[in-house]
Amino acid sequence: MKFTNSEKLHQEALQHIVGGVNSPSRAYKAVGGGSPVYMERGQGAYFWDVDDNKYIDYLAAYGPIITGHAHPHIAKAIAHAATTGVLYGTPTCLENEFAQMLKEAIPSLEKVRFNNSGTEAVMTTIRVARAYTGRTKIIKFAGCYHGHFDAVLVEAGSGPSTLGTPDSAGVPASTASDVITVPFNDIEAYKAALNKWGDQVAAVLVEPIVGNFGIVEPFKGFLQEVNELTHRAGALVIYDEVITAFRFTYGSAQQIYGVEPDMTAMGKIIGGGLPIGAYGGRKDIMEQVAPLGPAYQAGTMSGNPASMAAGIACLEVLKEEGVYEELDRLGKRLEEGILEQAREHGIHITVNRLCGALTVYFGVDQITNYAEADASDGEAFAKFFQLMLREGINLAPSKYEAWFLTTEHKDSDIENTIDAVGRSFAEMAKTL
């Protein structure tokens, strides 16, 4: 493959855009550097770049594009919105319709509010939790990403449960000190944190299925015990389902495990490819939000007709019979095929998968928390990424990210991908 036009465009971008990209995850820093590939169009499960190279896409825009690129039902809804006005600044019937769809799909949502991104949604749930409880501290789990706002850009210290330290320049230490970080799936560390700071904790922020250091499920009973301990301490449980809502089932991850949080933040898939965020939960908590309560949240673009129309159309596609069963079937075959190729070529990997999302980790035997994911072989992944790119397989350029299947992937795509994995592993095996 040649990437001449991508390389030229990246040099041009570096003159105008900070780092040449509008989100750091799009750079190839974690996979050896160089110019990222510039895509020109997408259709179904495929991308074509500016050099006319074709790819099977497993990035899915980091998760939102579960129905594939340019899905006709969603495209029609967006086109209609474009001709009737994309932004009014007034309430619309689409907001009512979409809110009702979300409530019917996720029973814990007694009231809903739309905004414009997952970051905004999580940020506001924290504000609401603090308003409701009168407390300030938040507990999060190490390695779980909840957006780029100050309150959650923190990392763990050296102990099993520690006050946070800033994970980004520009985040005040005073802000980070209100965030307590504990390892995911470690209920004893969580108990220790509550024992030490419980009367100061407003809420715990949980990815019920981790999506930001790969796909990692909770241990059996972990979420239930977190709920029980949190409520006993007088704090709230917030689920960050920005990645997980409508990814594994028609609804949310909380329904898979039979646990209800007090509030839920959403984004990505529910926008049908357009910018969106939403949060919701118990009525008495949500009524802390203005104009009913003292917790302020607003947005010029919130609930705009284009995003509402795209979101409604996306959920209509996902509600069709057999969607998630097919994603699971294809995901299982892809997982099995990758593991078969690894055994054949002597490549040490483990694969975490749920339904149509999976992560391939190099050089490790299991991944149940961030420390284990962090210990996986980044150099091996970088080599694998570059080889797969040249095989026409588009993956996220990070060892921590997931492969996302869409409703448009076919059996032939999976088999072609497994073959590409085999050729890539064969090349990697030469240097073992």
Swiss-Prot record:
Its cofactor is pyridoxal 5'-phosphate. The keyword Cytoplasm applies. Homodimer. Its main location: cytoplasm. The keyword Cytoplasm applies. One of its GO terms (biological process) is protoporphyrinogen IX biosynthetic process. Pathway: Porphyrin-containing compound metabolism; protoporphyrin-IX biosynthesis; 5-aminolevulinate from L-glutamyl-tRNA(Glu): step 2/2. InterPro entries: 4pyrrol_synth_GluAld_NH2Trfase, Aminotrans_3, PyrdxlP-dep_Trfase, PyrdxlP-dep_Trfase_major, PyrdxlP-dep_Trfase_small. GO terms for molecular function: glutamate-1-semialdehyde 2,1-aminomutase activity; pyridoxal phosphate binding; transaminase activity. This is Glutamate-1-semialdehyde 2,1-aminomutase 1. Belongs to the class-III pyridoxal-phosphate-dependent aminotransferase family. HemL subfamily. It comes from Oceanobacillus iheyensis (strain DSM 14371 / CIP 107618 / JCM 11309 / KCTC 3954 / HTE831). It comes from the Bacteria. HAMAP family: HemL_aminotrans_3. It catalyses: (S)-4-amino-5-oxopentanoate = 5-aminolevulinate. The lineage of its organism: Bacteria, Bacillati, Bacillota, Bacilli, Bacillales.
